[in-house]
Amino acid sequence: MPSFDIVSEVDKQEVRNAIDQVNKEVGTRFDFKGSDARVEQADYTLTVFADDEFKLDQVFDILTTKLAKRNVDVRSLDKGQVEKISGNKVKQLVTVKTGVESELAKKIIRLIKDSKLKVQGSIQGETVRVSGAKRDTLQEAIQLVKKSVTDFPLQFQNFRD
C-alpha cells in the first residue's frame, strides 16, 4: 500500500553555518564596530545578543537572510521576548521548531478526511503518515496539504509504493 510521511525538519548543520556567517558579518560591519552583538546556538535554541533593540533587529534580519540563503525555512523560527541584561544590553531567544506538533497533525488529518480522498492519515510521533490505495490520490493529498498549510514548513518524505 503506497504511503508517505509529512515531517518538519531543519538541517542543524546549515543553521550552524548560517550562525557562523552572521557572527563573521557582524564582526566586520562598520555599524556594529565596538558592539557586543552576536548569535549563539544551543541545540535548536538560538540566542541573539545586541547593545539595543535596533541592533537586535538588525542582527535578526541578517540571521534570517543567511538562513534563507542556506535553504532553511525562516517560518520555522519562533521569536521569544526581548530581555534586558546587564546595563542596556538586550538578548532574545529564538527557537527553531522541528517536528509536526500534535495540534497541526490533527489539523492535517482532519483536512485529509474532510477532502473525501481515499487515503488514511495517522500520527506517528512528530510525523504524519498518509497511506492510500493509489499513488495518484497520495499526490492529490500532497497538493491539498501544500495549499492549505502555509504557515509552517512541511516536507514530504518516504514516498513508497
Swiss-Prot record:
One of its GO terms (cellular component) is cytosol. GO terms for molecular function: nucleotide binding. InterPro entries: DUF520 (IPR007551), UPF0234_N (IPR035570), YajQ-like_sf (IPR036183). Keywords: Nucleotide-binding. Nucleotide-binding protein. Belongs to the YajQ family. HAMAP family: YajQ. NCBIfam families: PRK05412.1 (NF003819). This is Nucleotide-binding protein Nmul_A1044. It comes from Nitrosospira multiformis (strain ATCC 25196 / NCIMB 11849 / C 71). The lineage of its organism: Bacteria, Pseudomonadati, Pseudomonadota, Betaproteobacteria, Nitrosomonadales.
